[in-house]
């Protein structure tokens, strides 16, 4: 199996966290998001422990809420020693509603409105990741009006290409996020920030991309950031206390994908950082990482009921399910790969080549193409694996479809964490 929390029981059904997925679909319906809390906690602990053991005191991971965000997630993150990266007032509100400490929230965004800034300040968010000069000015003004000095990190782009998808490559020079180092603009950004009396500049942030499987791109980013930090020390006497290296470690969507050694990569990154600081006689800063996908992706899967089976002679066969791009738009957006398995018939031979399609009125509403399954029948249950990240959070009500429920499994039990939407929910905001 793709991950160790998945298995097949005596009935030939897929299990997750020891629970039968067929039984879960019968109890909670389908489509259904399933999140294995035990795997989630294991992933959190991997990051927390690796950073504590290898990085300076005060280093810890921040969960990237864009990957998955619902109220019941945040108590688990807090219990496991995680901070959280939030990108909107809605994510801030959700985290706080889940009892998450405001001081452990780091507020991102390349276009924070005045209302966003005010809400975050009034919510006592711990740190702002500042993206641009205009935000600096507005944040300084708003903090001053409240009589506070706000902690900030400055987002800079190191010009690193980690060879990932264009849509998730965020560290290159030509990017809407952050201020580029290479052009000299980041140096002016730092000078502007240091002159703001209501802001406390703690260090720098960079995020080079996603689905990165080795430490080397992060080490390259560290080299550039340390050179930049040294230049800022020489120019302004400013020493960065914190380097936030963003997220980006990858996950396995297919059996052919490499296994990512998170502790090994963090250990290699720490060694590289300490060596670079020693060469420059620069105090070793604490390090923050922002894992999202690698915390929740392999803790999640999605269950679907098969509806129609259609073979277009001389072309291909389609298996349609009762969900699609409304609950997982990533194949339509990126041709993102996923492993699809016959959850109710795991022991059957998989000799039927087919494309799994969704129910939306779009020819691009596909989940995966040209995969091997058993000869499918109506009401069979399919599972799409590794959907814990960027499925629930990217879901929509296109075609006025209700969003699925989300169930958390833990210690052999399942509990409803997010209820399924109703038709009444669809018109709740209509006037």
Regions picked out by a protein language model, each given a short descriptive name:
Residues 1-151, 187, 191, 195-200, ...:
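A charged N-terminal "starter" segment
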Residues 83, 126, 150, 202, ...:
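The start of beta-strands in P-loop NTPase/AAA+ ATPase cores
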Residues 67-69, 90-91, 111-113, 132-134, ...:
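Active-site-proximal loop/turn and secondary-structure-junction residues that shape catalytic pockets
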Residues 3, 159-308, 373, 401, ...:
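Active-site loop/helix belt of alpha/beta enzymes
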Residues 64, 151-157, 205-207, 244-246, ...:
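Short beta-strand segments
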Residues 268, 274-277, 282-431:
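Charged (often Lys/Glu-rich) extended helix/loop segments that serve as interaction or gating elements
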Residues 73-74, 97, 117-122, 139-142, ...:
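Short acidic, glycine/serine/threonine-rich loops at helix termini
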Residues 84-85, 105, 128, 204, ...:
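Hydrophobic residues within beta-strands of alpha/beta enzymes
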């Amino acid at each position: 199996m793709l991950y160790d929390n998945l298995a097949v029981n005596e009935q030939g059904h897929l299990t997750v966290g020891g629970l039968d997925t067929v039984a879960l679909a019968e109890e909670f319906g389908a489509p259904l998001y399933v999140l294995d809390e035990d795997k989630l906690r294991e992933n959190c602990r991997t990051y927390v422990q690796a950073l504590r053991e290898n990085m300076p005191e005060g280093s810890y991971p921040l969960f990237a809420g864009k990957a998955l965000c619902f109220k019941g997630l945040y108590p688990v993150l807090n219990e496991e020693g995680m901070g959280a990266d939030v990108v909107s007032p809605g994510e801030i509100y959700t985290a706080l509603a889940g009892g998450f400490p405001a001081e452990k929230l780091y507020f991102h965004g390349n276009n924070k409105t005045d209302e966003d800034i005010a809400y975050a300040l009034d919510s006592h968010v711990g740190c702002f990741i500042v993206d641009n000069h205009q935000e600096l000015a507005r944040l300084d003004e708003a903090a001053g009006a409240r009589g506070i000095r706000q902690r900030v990190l400055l987002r800079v782009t190191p010009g690193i290409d980690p060879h990932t998808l264009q849509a998730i490559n965020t560290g290159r020079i030509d990017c809407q996020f952050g201020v580029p180092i290479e052009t000299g603009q980041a140096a002016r950004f730092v000078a502007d920030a240091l002159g703001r009396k209501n802001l406390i500049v703690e260090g720098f942030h960079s995020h080079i991309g996603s689905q990165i499987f080795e430490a080397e791109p992060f080490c390259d980013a560290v080299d550039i950031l340390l050179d930049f930090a040294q230049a800022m020390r020489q120019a302004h006497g400013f020493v960065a206390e914190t380097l936030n290296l963003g997220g980006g470690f990858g996950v396995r969507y297919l059996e052919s994908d490499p296994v990512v050694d998170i502790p090994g990569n963090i250990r290699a990154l720490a060694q590289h950082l300490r060596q670079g600081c020693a060469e420059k006689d620069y105090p070793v800063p604490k390090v923050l990482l922002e894992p999202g996908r690698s915390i929740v992706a392999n803790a999640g899967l999605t269950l679907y009921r098969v509806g129609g089976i259609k073979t277009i002679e001389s072309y291909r066969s389609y298996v349609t399910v009762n969900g699609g791009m409304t609950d997982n738009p990533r194949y339509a957006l990126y041709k993102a790969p996923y492993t699809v398995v016959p959850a109710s018939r795991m022991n059957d031979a998989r000799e039927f080549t087919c494309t799994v399609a969704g129910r939306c009125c779009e020819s691009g509403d596909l989940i995966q193409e040209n995969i091997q399954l058993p000869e499918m029948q109506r009401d069979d249950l399919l599972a799409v694996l590794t959907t814990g990240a960027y499925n629930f959070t990217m879901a929509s009500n296109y075609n006025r479809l209700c969003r699925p429920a989300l169930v958390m499994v833990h210690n052999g039990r399942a509990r409803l964490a997010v209820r399924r939407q109703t038709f009444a929910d669809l018109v709740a905001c209509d006037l």
